[in-house]
Amino acid sequence: MKNISILGATGSIGTQTLDVIRNDSEAFKLLAVSAHSNFKKMIEIIDEFKPELVVMVDKLAYNKVLDYCCEKKLKTSVKVGYEAFNEVASYKDSNIVVTSIVGMIGLIPTLEAIKAGKDIALANKETLVVAGELVTKEAKKYGVNILPVDSEHGAIFQCLQGNKYKDINKILLTASGGPFRGKSFDELNNVTLNDALNHPKWTMGRKITIDSATLMNKGLEVIEAHWLFNVDYEKIQVLVHPQSIVHSMVQYKDGSVIAQLGPTDMRLPIQYALNYPVRKERIVEPVDFYSTPDLHFEKPDMDTFRCLRLAYDAGMAGGIMPAILNSANEYAVDLFLKDKIKFTNIQEIIEDALNHFENVNNLTANTIINKSNEVTKYLKGKIGF
């Protein structure tokens, strides 16, 4: 039996991880969980899975959960605040930590989990984006596996099984194209928040859905793939694949291409990561090739969707630039979600931040966090909110 901890248990990935655990309760035990403020869902998790440790960020939510556990006379330990995430990440008897919180807030808990010798089921792509070199070095030092949870990197990981990384000619990273595929920049000027949140294929959290609409999500995944698979950026190619059936491919030096195909259901890569290296019975219905539409692939429009180009540029520059990219994106997307800026302002804000700050190398976690805070402060001062 594997003991599981989940950072971000009430969000989209966390909820689907719980479904995987629920589906194979003899293989998994949930020991520790965290969430921000959804105390109702957390109480449901406590009732069903009986975790030993629960952390809530929001003080009101913490009090609600604590009162419930006291009322039911449960032995569950309930703690409050982001600092307590580290306790979930390094919980003594856990074997694997699912990092499904959004944003670079996941960096420190991920490093703590690695230092505690826990394998990482990584759904928090920002951790590798902002600190890929640091995280991969620490994982190697402590003998920890970093297992990709998102569909594209999970697909690449499966395509690499039984092969050697040195034989990779190219990673073909697929993208649905998002809700605005084919639109011009002028058309993007008029899109609404609801338009951007209407993803054609995937049901996800709000922030990642906007990232998918700008193609920044794919840009972040390019940087993540660079660190996960030790592949140069020149060998990572994005293909727009609107059917979202091929989740990614690997082309080898002999010209052969291995692809992973499946339904648009995140439980599939989650199940593979949690059970690795064992492949379990299916939890989702497989692709029906008789009813599958034709598969199409096209080049991404990086002139209209500049976020993807900015991500490539930041990744190839290295150093602190990916962290600047990420912080500016988090700030801009938050403003868009609050209806304070236009959709096209997102990439303009990111480009401004990348041009403003100089590169820095030899990064520590503190350097990354401090610079990210500087980016937010700079943008707030310039934009006014």
UniProtKB/Swiss-Prot annotation:
Keywords, in A-Z order: Isoprene biosynthesis, Manganese, Metal-binding, NADP, Oxidoreductase
Signal peptide: none
Protein name: 1-deoxy-D-xylulose 5-phosphate reductoisomerase
Known pathway: Isoprenoid biosynthesis; isopentenyl diphosphate biosynthesis via DXP pathway; isopentenyl diphosphate from 1-deoxy-D-xylulose 5-phosphate: step 1/6
Record gene name: dxr
Annotated Mn(2+) binding sites: D150, E152, E221
EC number: 1.1.1.267
Record family assignment: Belongs to the DXR family.
Catalytic activity: 2-C-methyl-D-erythritol 4-phosphate + NADP(+) = 1-deoxy-D-xylulose 5-phosphate + NADPH + H(+)
Family annotation (Pfam families): DXP_redisom_C, DXP_reductoisom, DXPR_C
Main function: Catalyzes the NADPH-dependent rearrangement and reduction of 1-deoxy-D-xylulose-5-phosphate (DXP) to 2-C-methyl-D-erythritol 4-phosphate (MEP).
Cofactor(s) this protein cannot do without: Mg(2+); Mn(2+)
SUPFAM superfamilies assigned to the protein according to its UniProt record, in alphabetical order: 1-deoxy-D-xylulose-5-phosphate reductoisomerase, C-terminal domain, Glyceraldehyde-3-phosphate dehydrogenase-like, C-terminal domain, NAD(P)-binding Rossmann-fold domains
Coiled coil: none
Organism: Clostridium acetobutylicum (strain ATCC 824 / DSM 792 / JCM 1419 / IAM 19013 / LMG 5710 / NBRC 13948 / NRRL B-527 / VKM B-1787 / 2291 / W)
Top-level enzyme category: oxidoreductase
Highest taxon listed in the record's lineage: Bacteria
InterPro entries for this protein: DXP_reductoisomerase, DXP_reductoisomerase_C, DXP_reductoisomerase_N, DXPR_C, DXPR_C_sf, NAD(P)-bd_dom_sf
MF (Gene Ontology): 1-deoxy-D-xylulose-5-phosphate reductoisomerase activity; manganese ion binding; NADPH binding
UniProt record, GO biological process: isopentenyl diphosphate biosynthetic process, methylerythritol 4-phosphate pathway involved in terpenoid biosynthetic process
Residues the record lists as binding 1-deoxy-D-xylulose 5-phosphate: K125, S151, E152, S176, H199, S212, N217, K218, E221
Residues that coordinate or bind NADPH: T10, G11, S12, I13, N38, N124, E126, G205
